């Protein structure tokens, strides 16, 4: 409702969603491709900016796609757990005697990340402007979709609880001698024990297994 009245507002809304998810989803490909992209694509199609019709790309879809790509990179750089390669940098720094915590990374990345967050959509809006500037129907569409989805389910509440537990442990885990890897397994265990996820879900996450193998 706040961001949905213009194409620029939609860009900021999608970027904000990415930033909010980044601390607890340490895979920028899963976050960008699996969560943000389907939402962004649905928005574009709702305004007749269709991937299969090149003549409609510039109406809205191209702008939102480029913006989501850059916002994903910005969100990934702001948090230690924003992408899988960040903990590797932390390890390399530790080998040089430099201790980087979740909080110190966030403190260093917050200001440049925040500046980029506000500047990038505006720059893209000037350099690669969408043909559609006003999207007044977006809030109504969102409200209708929320109504169709119904109230938040028990599993969604449990997922939200796990999100905040993980975020808290990643931030304060150092003081409790709980490292980031242990925190990730705690979160996975909670989701499995509460049946939010099944082992079949875990096995089907090919991207996560790729990350474990290649970044281990």
Briefly describe each language-model feature range.
Residues 2-78, 84-96:
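Hydrophobic transmembrane alpha-helices that form the pore/transport pathway of multi-pass ion
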Residues 95-100, 104-216:
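Hydrophobic transmembrane alpha-helices of multi-pass small-molecule transporters
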Residues 78-79, 85, 112, 190:
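Short, flexible micro-motifs
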């Amino acid at each position: 409702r706040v961001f949905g009245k213009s194409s620029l507002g939609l860009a900021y809304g999608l970027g904000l969603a990415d930033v909010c998810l980044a601390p607890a989803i340490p895979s920028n490909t899963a976050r960008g491709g699996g969560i943000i992209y389907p939402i962004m694509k649905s928005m574009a199609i709702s305004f007749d900016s269709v991937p299969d019709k090149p003549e409609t790309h510039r109406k809205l879809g191209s702008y939102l796609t480029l913006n989501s790509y850059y916002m994903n990179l910005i969100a990934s750089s702001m948090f230690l757990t924003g992408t899988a390669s960040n903990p590797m940098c932390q390890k390399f720094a530790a080998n040089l005697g430099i201790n980087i915590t979740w909080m110190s990374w966030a403190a260093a990345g917050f200001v440049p990340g925040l500046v980029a967050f506000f500047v990038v959509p505006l720059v893209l809006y000037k350099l690669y402007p969408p043909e559609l500037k006003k999207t007044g129907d977006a809030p109504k569409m969102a409200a209708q979709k929320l109504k169709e989805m119904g109230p938040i389910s028990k599993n969604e509440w449990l997922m939200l609880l796990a999100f905040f537990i993980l975020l808290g442990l990643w931030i304060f885990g150092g003081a409790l001698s709980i490292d980031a890897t242990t925190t990730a397994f705690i979160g996975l265990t909670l989701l499995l024990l509460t049946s939010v996820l099944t082992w079949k879900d875990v096995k089907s996450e090919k991207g996560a297994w790729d990350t474990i193998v290649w970044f281990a």
